[in-house]
Amino acid sequence: MAAAASESLSSGGPGAVRLPRLPPLKVLAGQLRRHAEGGPGAWRLSRAAVGRAPLELVAVWMQGTVLAAEGGQARLRDSSGAFSVRGLERVPRGRPCLLPGKYVMVMGVVQACSPEPCLQAVKMTDLSDNPVHESMWELEVEDLHRNIP
């Protein structure tokens, strides 16, 4: 039954996103911009530089500061660069978080990686209340990628 649920389409009509079956991979915007290969529905993160096989990018987890938001889209920045998120009008957000300066987590499906990453949002959460989230994010991502075989 869980498999059937994970294969369903999210509600929202046109542009609905197929919900991922794998947990999201924590990434930085710069990693997607420099090391992503493939295309929509078949993105991979190259790890050839460290002698490892690429990672499938079904869904990603990114964090960043909101630079601008309008009409269900937002532009964010993490420590490695800017990225865009769309489809925000259809995702659960909890507290209002689409305000410039807010630090947020976005889980989404990669739509593009160049010239800058763009995600179709599945979930968004405001992390602004605890500055540790922002200060530790780059280290969390680095640690994860160092330990994935």
Curated annotation (Swiss-Prot):
PTM comment, free text: Phosphorylated during mitosis.
GO biological process, one term: regulation of sister chromatid segregation
Cellular component GO terms, alphabetical: cytosol; nuclear speck; nucleus; RecQ family helicase-topoisomerase III complex
InterPro entries, per database record: NA-bd_OB-fold, RMI2
Keywords for the protein's UniProt record, in alphabetical order: DNA replication, DNA-binding, Nucleus, Phosphoprotein
GO MF term set: DNA binding
Modified residues (Phosphoserine): 8
DNA-binding residues (ranges): 46-116
Location in the cell: Nucleus
Known function: Essential component of the RMI complex, a complex that plays an important role in the processing of homologous recombination intermediates. It is required to regulate sister chromatid segregation and to limit DNA crossover. Essential for the stability, localization, and function of BLM, TOP3A, and complexes containing BLM. In the RMI complex, it is required to target BLM to chromatin and stress-induced nuclear foci and mitotic phosphorylation of BLM.
Subunit structure: Component of the RMI complex, containing at least TOP3A, RMI1 and RMI2. The RMI complex interacts with BLM.
Family: Belongs to the RMI2 family.
Protein name from the UniProt record: RecQ-mediated genome instability protein 2
Lineage, highest ranks first: Eukaryota, Metazoa, Chordata, Craniata, Vertebrata
